[in-house]
Amino acid sequence: MELRPSAAELCRENLRRNGLIGTVVTGELGGRYPELPWGGYDLAVANPPYFPQNTGKTAPDAARALARTEGSYTLRAGCEAASKLCRNGGKFALCLRPERLAELFAALADTGFAPKRLQLLQPSAEREANLALVEAVRGGKPGLRVLPVRIER
């Protein structure tokens, strides 16, 4: 689900280039889309806005503001949508700022997911992690594996 048509097309192109099969729909999370059967997916992937409303740096343009700051898409709304779309045992993968992990884990638990893997990314060895990659399983048992920190140089 992608709100911006240009970003949705980029997602489709990335799927094609990587030989992957997937469905990318342009629209709002709260809608009902016949092309997205409930419980029909093995994997849902999300790159939610990094910051709650009225926080974070001011974006230089409307497209970046939409991508960076929550509006209709909140972490909880993303988890609720993934819970409806994924089959039992299906995975939900997403990236977000590390300071939002507690909020994410609460939303995952409330929507029937168990976080299974976590990896933090650092821009350099001297700086704090600025991105968290999380994989959760719908209906999964407790047990989180924390992978080694990855340093992006």
List where the protein language model places each region.
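The conserved SAM/SAH-binding core of class I Rossmann-like methyltransferase domains
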Residues: M1
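Conserved SAM/SAH-binding beta-strand->alpha-helix loop
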Residues: R4-S6
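Conserved SAM-binding loop
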Residues: C11-R12
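Conserved SAM-binding strand-loop segment of SAM-dependent methyltransferases
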Residues: G19-P34
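A short acidic, Gly/Pro-enriched loop at the edge of an enzyme's catalytic core
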Residues: P34-A44
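Mobile active-site "lid"/loop adjacent to the S-adenosyl-L-methionine
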Residues: L43, P48-A77
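Conserved Class I SAM-dependent methyltransferase catalytic core
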Residues: G71-L133
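Flexible, glycine-/basic-rich loop-and-beta segments that form/coincide
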Residues: A125-R153
